[in-house]
């Protein structure tokens, strides 16, 4: 288990303030926050690259020492994939991975290097020097180096930023498989809501150097009532006065040229009286009056009006066929 206890860091101003959380073996923890919230600083503390003014980091009940100390046992089992890549620019792609796997027996090292070259689609550039590769290729190479020795804890600081959709999906599957097979603990920092929601077992929100909330992906999607946190995940924030909530992802709505907000569903949902807070630069509160029975909807909401009453078509409570 990875445990973060009462971590505080300050430079010219407080960056992290009394941060505490735990991640069990095999868990993936998502960490989200705005730029400057302290996410990368926290990863640097966990990886041992930065010593906190206060607090400790524990791995399997062993306290990990500050980086100022000469001996740092345990940090070989915590690997950070930063946004700086940390590659040897004058060595080839294959040599960079081989160096990261240096402590493995020779046969195991060869198999591991070949597997990583194939996994992250680096085989075609295996003989190219790192400083001659693209940003996306350097990102993938950095990930390959980090997981070469199969660490207990993997820290990912915006790891998918330079990967195309196919490589993102491939890396998603590999991370999940590695977590299951080796009980790998992963701390994921990302500005992309889909990364956090798609991979995480728990999501922490970092605001002004403090952890403001902890949510499961389900609760973050359906029951998150903090506007700022909802925006970080790319979710339009909505609630109603009865406490019922429903959420629309960005790919489920669009604003028409006539100023109408189109919400398009291919399934049945329950709605009471919903207060929809739609944000497009300004806050527009719209009350939608509807039946409490399920309905299939492709509704048009006039975001230029404060209130719109709409009668919904009643249907039987079953799922609609997906289009």
Role assignments for model-derived ranges:
Residues 148-152:
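A short, proline-enriched helix->beta-strand linker immediately N-terminal to the Walker B motif
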Residues 129-133, 137:
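Conserved ABC ATPase signature
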Residues 108-125, 177:
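Conserved ABC ATPase "signature" region
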Residues 63-79, 103:
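ABC ATPase NBD coupling module
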Residues 154-158:
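Catalytic Walker B motif of ABC-type/P-loop ATPase nucleotide-binding domains
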Residues 47:
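Helix-to-loop junction immediately C-terminal to a conserved catalytic motif
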Residues 208-209:
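Conserved ABC ATPase "signature" C-loop
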